[in-house]
Amino acid sequence: MAGDDGVQSEIGKDGVLAHLLSPDSTRSRDEPEIATNIGVQLQHMGLKTWSISILRRLRDALGRLQPQSILEVGAGIGHRSAWIYDMFAIDGKHPAQYQLVEDGAKFAVILRRLMLRHDAESYTKIVVGNLDVLVGESNAWFAASSTGVEIGSPPLERNHDAIIVDGTSEQRARHVESLLPFLSTGGVLFTVEPDMPLGDIDESDTE
């Protein structure tokens, strides 16, 4: 992973995570224009996305990591992807591979438009389907290939330097576990904390 060795040698392994998630003062704090427009669409569609502050931290971390392979799960209509594509454009470089996974075919059409707008066909792969099924099919493919039998390619590649996981709180927990084997050595998986439970808290509850 480009940039990773330099980061670790400068600050030591214990400080890598804190360094990755710290704000990068050299980057704009404004939301990219395309991401802003997609954010308006999200509101009209009643969909949720990560907060601007989290998206900034993700972008800053990816900028430091300079991953050569990224897997984004739960890409939606591309709000987070627009931030990432904008970073590629500003930096003047992109990874060798950027896989976007989305369960809905209609959303995949929107993702394709975003990909074309950024001239990212050469390194972007949009995968449509249920992640649990895709992981199972990919694991089966890798098991078969280890015996010398290879037909086509797996739905999901392995050895990603960065994996981004979105979805409901329950989905995220399950998907994080199933996707850890798809990380490269030294790779980083990004997600958000579990959703806070709603409702009243019993006054006798001491937890």
Model-derived features: where do they sit?
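Rossmann-like AdoMet
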Residues: 1-69, 96
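A short acidic, Gly/Pro-enriched loop at the edge of an enzyme's catalytic core
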Residues: 139-163
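Generic enzyme active-site microenvironment
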Residues: 70, 100, 164, 190-191
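C-terminal substrate-binding/active-site "lid" region of AdoMet-derived donor-dependent transferases
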Residues: 152-156, 162, 169-207
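Generic detector of well-ordered alpha-helical packing
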Residues: 73, 103, 167, 192-194
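Short, flexible loop segments at the rims of nucleotide/cofactor-binding pockets, characterized by
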Residues: 47-50, 163-169
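SAM cofactor-binding core of SAM-dependent methyltransferases
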Residues: 47-137
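Short, flexible/disordered intra-domain loops and linkers
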Residues: 5-7, 136-144, 199-205
